[in-house]
A protein has these predicted regions:
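Active-site phosphate-binding strand-loop segment of PLP-dependent enzymes
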Residues: 138, 143-193
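Conserved PLP-anchoring active-site segment centered on the Schiff-base-forming lysine
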Residues: 108-130
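Structural signature of beta-strand start/N-cap positions in the alpha/beta core
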Residues: 30, 115, 136, 162-165
Length: 193
């Protein structure tokens, strides 16, 4: 009953590690859990109050898949104000989380056999998201000597006509390494071939 695509993905290492850590905690072990990336703070009160107010005011119906126009506009203004970036409203999409947005983007753009370059270490979900969309993850090891970041030379070695995406986030999950503007520009130059 399950599709072949789903049978090709592995169980979540994040969930498995988190479950093991919780098991050790229940057994009385002193464990610091770094697996699931759960914040160690509660949702701020003003956000909780706004959510409760929205529910009490009947804001409980379906909204557009890309987010409400008011939320898209608020995001557009935030990027203009805080980051000096101008985005068209049509280029702003709101999702339930990063994994959801990445999955949707790959679903819309990856064809069978397309390759996605993924610098390692990487967030454990990236390869499976590619596989679920019938693509091929291309893992590029990025060692400590480069700050766990992909270099233009390593990127160029892995780009080919089947390359559709470079999966790049800064700060990196899981290492926290950040790319400078110059590093991003150099990587961008490689992608313009």
């Amino acid at each position: 009953m399950i599709s072949n695509r789903v049978n090709n993905i592995k169980p979540s290492l994040t969930i498995a590690t988190n479950m093991k850590a919780q098991e050790l905690k229940r057994a009385g072990k002193d464990v610091i859990v770094l697996a699931a990336g759960e914040p160690d703070f509660d949702t701020p009160d003003h956000i909780k109050s706004a959510a409760i107010e929205a529910i009490n005011n009947g804001f409980t119906k379906y909204v557009p898949g890309k987010g409400t126009p008011d939320l898209q506009l608020a995001i557009q203004k935030k990027f203009q104000r805080d980051n000096n970036l101008d985005y068209e409203l049509g280029n702003i999409t709101v999702g339930v989380g990063g994994k959801h947005i990445i999955y949707n983007a790959f679903s819309a753009t990856i064809n069978s056999g397309d390759e996605v370059i993924i610098p390692a270490p990487y967030w454990v979900s990236y390869p499976d998201i590619v596989i679920l969309n019938d693509g091929k993850p291309v893992i590029v090891e990025c060692g400590e000597q480069n700050g766990f970041k992909i270099t233009p030379e390593d990127l160029e070695k892995h780009i080919n006509p089947k390359t559709k995406w470079l999966m790049l986030n800064s700060p990196s999950n899981p290492t926290g390494s950040m790319y400078s503007k110059d590093e991003l520009t150099a990587l961008g130059d490689c992608l313009l071939y």
